Amino acid sequence: MAKRDYYEVLGVSKTAEEREIKKAYKRLAMKYHPDRNQGDKEAEAKFKEIKAAYEVLTDAQKRAAYDQYGHAAFEQGGMGGGFNGGADFSDIFGDVFGDIFGGGRGRQRAARGADLRYNMDLTLEEAVRGVTKEIRIPTLEECDVCHGSGAKAGTQPQTCPTCHGSGQVQMRQGFFAVQQTCPHCQGRGTLIKDPCHKCHGHGRVEKSKTLSVKIPAGVDTGDRIRLAGEGEAGEHGAPAGDLYVQVQVKQHPIFEREGNNLYCEVPINFAMAALGGEIEVPTLDGRVKLKVPSETQTGKLFRMRGKGVKSVRGGSQGDLLCRVVVETPVGLSEKQKQLLKDLQESFGGPTGEKNSPRSKSFFDGVKKFFDDLTR
């Protein structure tokens, strides 16, 4: 069967720059990669065709030969035109295809251990003051029998006889030698003849471990604490991953936190709001007295400096802001109701101008609104 033109395969012109070729290759490789089209023979054939076109058109020597001789340049025996191969393709997939599907160059390194995440719930008090907590996590630990090698005690992994430890083998394609991952050792460069009886050659075993985690004062929801090397053990002696402790602060019954400031609502009765006085308000360090001036309205904020949260990164401490809520009295006796009626009369009715300036302003605005509508 005649082979399609490589430029046509990638959908680029014969004058396309390498950047355009790589872009086209990435797009098509994503579409036809076998991992995305399992069992689809047509997609697999298409992918091989795309790969072959890319290998030729991104190599200056190969591309020149292809432009001159076409596919004949790569058939066994070739055109005999002073062209004697040796191009190294070990970085083709590292530079382009590896970015998409995780391929690598040369011998594969043993994989670093996976990072782990632990969600930790804290009370507001614990988050503000700091705390040390013990946690228990399931993980993969280095095998204590083979010490991560995967080989039976007293033995060592052997150098792969196929690739001689390089993790790569060369295959001839016409004039050219193409490097591929060794199919015998899967790119590791070593083989385990006698696997460890405990980890069965993996170098890691499942375990649970207990850690003591120091939470610094001032942390908040969303903060992460990194414990280096406390993640899963790496493969065959590779470095371990890290453990990330994700902080979540529970809702507090009294305080709300915004940054390093704390907020709380303080209810007072309308007599205290009108006449003023002194009340006790809570802080994280205990109760403190707060002076309420006369004629205090709902929503007024009182700032208590330095009664908030100290920044986890050092520096100044936040404040406590107390928001006053003036409560309407309930469960009134007949006598209290009469007293309130007398008080209302003394105000000059519900919209008393002198004693309720905001009410007068509001009702004056309402009256003007309706007057304007009827004009």
Curated annotation (Swiss-Prot):
Protein's UniProt name: Chaperone protein DnaJ
Family matches, as InterPro entries: DnaJ (IPR012724), DnaJ_C (IPR002939), DnaJ_domain (IPR001623), DnaJ_domain_CS (IPR018253), HSP40/DnaJ_pept-bd (IPR008971), HSP_DnaJ_Cys-rich_dom (IPR001305), HSP_DnaJ_Cys-rich_dom_sf (IPR036410), J_dom_sf (IPR036869)
Keywords from the UniProt entry: Chaperone, Cytoplasm, DNA replication, Metal-binding, Repeat, Stress response, Zinc, Zinc-finger
Co-factor binding comment: Binds 2 Zn(2+) ions per monomer.
A GO-annotated cellular component: cytoplasm
Domain of life, per lineage: Bacteria
Lineage summary: Bacteria, Pseudomonadati, Pseudomonadota, Gammaproteobacteria, Enterobacterales
Principal place of residence: cytoplasm
Protein residues bound to Zn(2+) 2: C160, C163, C182, C185
Encoding gene, per UniProt annotation: dnaJ
Domains (record comment): The J domain is necessary and sufficient to stimulate DnaK ATPase activity. Zinc center 1 plays an important role in the autonomous, DnaK-independent chaperone activity of DnaJ. Zinc center 2 is essential for interaction with DnaK and for DnaJ activity.
